[in-house]
Amino acid sequence: MRLMKKEKSMKQIILTGDRPTGRLHVGHYVGSLKERVRLQNSGKFDEIYIMIADAQALTDNADNPEKVRQNVLQVALDYLAVGIDPAKAHIFIQSMVPELTELSFYYMNLVTVSRLQRNPTVKAEIQQKNFESSIPVGFFTYPISQAADITAFKATTVPAGEDQRPRSEEHTSELQSPFYLVCR
């Protein structure tokens, strides 16, 4: 796991999370959960936000929203089981924060289709999911939603796996836009 970090600010804030498309498993523990618990207990962060990204999960599970809904509670319980402490970390459900959707909408006016098409992670996931030319708009634009999540919480640290690196770097670039600077 690699930590994608923005410039140092007054408050040190972590934003991380998971899509509730099933139970978390050993791969999640080794890949991110163990590190989250370590960061939570490090004392280096003023605020820690752990998002259950149900809205993002719908971008490629729109045909089965019940699967997503049923796993929200399970993911929260899995967080508690591995040692995420609600006294130290804020666990929240993405769809319960409507401002994230609103901010995503504004950001969609700043990012071009060609920029999204060039994102190597998005390209790989489109191929992996066999979307071909029938790419759902929500799926195609979810990197914009992720940028909104990051900026809304003013996250300084976004723990991300190597597969997220191109997207995290793109978010960092997007966050330097005049719109972001005005909205801070």
Where are the regions that the model predicts?
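Acidic, His- and aromatic-enriched active-site or binding-groove loops in soluble protein domains
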Residues: V111-V122
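Non-catalytic terminal extensions that flank enzyme cores
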Residues: M1-T21, Q40-D46, L77, P86-A89, ...
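Short, glycine/charge-rich beta-strand/loop segments that flank catalytic centers
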Residues: A87-T101, P120-K129
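Aromatic (phenylalanine/tyrosine) cluster motif
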Residues: F179-Y180
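Histidine-anchored nucleotide/phosphate-binding helix
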Residues: V26-I50
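Short, conserved active-site loops that position catalytic residues or coordinate cofactors/metal ions
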Residues: E47-T59
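Glycine-rich loop at the start of a catalytic domain that most often binds anionic cofactors/ligands
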Residues: L58-A76, E102-M108
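Active-site cores that bind ATP or allylic diphosphates and position pyrophosphate for catalysis
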Residues: K123-L175, R184
